[in-house]
Amino acid sequence: MKCYTQLTEGLYLGNQFSTSIITEINVIVSIGCKSKSTIPSIVNYKVSVRDSVDSDLTPLFGDVTEFIHINLSNNKKVLVHCQGGVNRSPIFAIAYLARYIMTLEEAVLHVSTLRSTVRIQPHYLHQLEKWLNDIIICKNQTNKL
């Protein structure tokens, strides 16, 4: 299994070792670990979160998915990674896909099909589902005004 997987045009998912292997990356989103990239031209976005049942990712989904979206919209190549590339980074990649491209169910299936080592913790998936529902409610309320 490669240490990284291409999910869409410009979006990659990987583990801690992928930061030093993918040469065409412009932006690295590091979830809970340090990027090993020392190339000055690469933008490093650090998200501090432990992989724990006590971790609440909800406040992070908005900023991280928007950051990914802005960079992909500017034709940047974005790598989202955590230590193992199994749980935390996949949930943020899924959050991006579900917010901007496809349904949550489609995003989970897409990512887990392309990267068979993905094992999303149920509490993270629940947090993401609630966050996405809150976005829909906010949009509906705004449209009524």
Residue ranges of each PLM-predicted region?
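Intrinsically disordered, low-complexity regulatory segments in eukaryotic proteins
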Residues: 144-145
